[in-house]
């Protein structure tokens, strides 16, 4: 968390504070891709080239075919669409080593810096 704290382009997608706690089965960040020279898809590709597999966080329900056919429209949910376009799920698992965590963090920070 401290590596992305107060970053101008990267934000934590989920803030845990007070009496709340998390199992941390996912680690999510939000990146303002409008401030970068590369798209989210290109960002994914660059991470993959560095052997970091990230994922699109959950696709909003109205974007699923079934709900689209029912008339749900993402234009009515601009915040959900923005969150979807900015949020990445990063590797997080029990045996993740500190060195691997550091590599993921440094790679993300470097990619953002190179593409501002």
Residue ranges and their predicted role:
Residues 1-116:
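PLP-dependent aminotransferase class I/II
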